[in-house]
From Swiss-Prot:
The lineage of its organism: Eukaryota, Metazoa, Chordata, Craniata, Vertebrata. Monomer. Homodimer. The majority of CLEC5A is expressed as a monomeric form on macrophages. Interacts with TYROBP/DAP12. The interaction with TYROBP is required for CLEC5A cell surface expression. Interacts with HCST/DAP10. Forms a CLEC5A/TYROBP/HCST trimolecular complex depending almost solely on TYROBP. It comes from Homo sapiens (Human). Disulfide bonds join 71-82, 99-183, 161-175. CDD domains: CLECT_NK_receptors_like. The keyword Membrane applies. Functions as a positive regulator of osteoclastogenesis. Cell surface receptor that signals via TYROBP. Regulates inflammatory responses. (Microbial infection) Critical macrophage receptor for dengue virus serotypes 1-4. The binding of dengue virus to CLEC5A triggers signaling through the phosphorylation of TYROBP. This interaction does not result in viral entry, but stimulates pro-inflammatory cytokine release. This is C-type lectin domain family 5 member A. One of its GO terms (cellular component) is cytosol.
Length: 188
């Protein structure tokens, strides 16, 4: 039997498999156009979510590429959710309607990890989120009606909406003043 022919054949097969793998990985980056308006986006997750380990990374996030899950163009991907950070400003009600028009809601920031992720990408701007004060109950609720158990700073009698961004906290704000907004929806 001619062993060098078999080894040469195996090397060719391995090179073809490696070449095909690289082609499939980088082809979407070369031709980033799509007919449905979706594109691959950055993905953030804890180390344990990505690698199955129990120890988080030092900053709590690790950047990966997500090829199986997509968000619309200009939306950010995090933990199977898509987030849109607007550059325009409007009142809380207009912001809620804007998000609804995009098939989403104002962001429900109900975990410390989600808050950190959003604060890391909001820069030095204030953004409305889906948190509103119910005077009759004297408590804050998310727009999905779940109870907010955290603290809101800068509370004032006329401040019934909440923002995040400038500080590392939830800040009460007037619902009538114009701020940017964060919309949230499921990734596809």
């Amino acid at each position: 039997m001619n062993w060098h022919m078999i080894i040469s054949g195996l090397i060719v097969v391995v090179l073809k498999v490696v070449g095909m793998t690289l082609f499939l990985l980088y082809f979407p980056q070369i031709f980033n156009k799509s007919n449905d308006g979706f594109t691959t986006t950055r993905s953030y997750g804890t180390v344990s979510q990505i690698f199955g380990s129990s120890s988080p990374s030092p900053n709590g996030f690790i950047t990966t590429r997500s090829y199986g899950t997509v968000c619309p163009k200009d939306w950010e991907f995090y933990q199977a959710r898509c987030f849109f950070l607007s550059t325009s400003e409007s009142s809380w009600n207009e912001s809620r309607d804007f998000c609804k028009g995009k098939g989403s809601t104002l962001a429900i920031v109900n975990t410390p990890e989600k808050l950190k992720f959003l604060q890391d990408i909001t820069d030095a701007e204030k953004y409305f989120i889906g948190l509103i004060y119910h005077r009759e109950e004297k408590r804050w609720r998310w727009i999905n009606n779940s109870v907010f158990n955290g603290n809101v700073t800068n509370q004032n009698q006329n401040f019934n909406c909440a923002t995040i961004g400038l500080t590392k906290t939830f800040d009460a704000a007037s619902c009538d003043i114009s701020y940017r907004r964060i919309c949230e929806k499921n990734a596809k």
